[in-house]
Amino acid sequence: MSMQDPIADMLTRIRNGQAANKVAVTMPSSKLKVAIANVLKEEGYIEDFKIEGDTKPELEITLKYFQGKAVVESIQRVSRPSLRIYKRKDELPQVMAGLGIAVVSTSKGVMTDRAARQAGLGGEIICYVA
């Protein structure tokens, strides 16, 4: 069976991995998944990530914990294949009054809502992380 929404699968693996106190989670890799993992690492939500394998690359994400608790409290998919959500720069949402982030896919790449607002860009809202 083919995967209908690989990004939702990635977010679910991260959520389930942290709920089970796993050190790392692995998944099939793609350019978009690597870009999302890079944003999560820059914002401090995950420890690290690496890509392994040549013919079928796997993305391994090392999860982050603080005093035994998961750093990611909630992670949810917003725009999905059946319902894409696009926002202009002045419509970009603030997650938890600025305490969380919205991951946005723009014409200049994948970035946080703050970075997109600063660059004056809108785009597709991929997910919310808090």
Swiss-Prot record:
Pfam families: Ribosomal_S8 (PF00410). It comes from the Bacteria. One of its GO terms (cellular component) is ribosome. PROSITE patterns: RIBOSOMAL_S8 (PS00053). Part of the 30S ribosomal subunit. Contacts proteins S5 and S12. HAMAP family: Ribosomal_uS8_B (MF_01302_B). One of the primary rRNA binding proteins, it binds directly to 16S rRNA central domain where it helps coordinate assembly of the platform of the 30S subunit. This is Small ribosomal subunit protein uS8. The gene is rpsH.
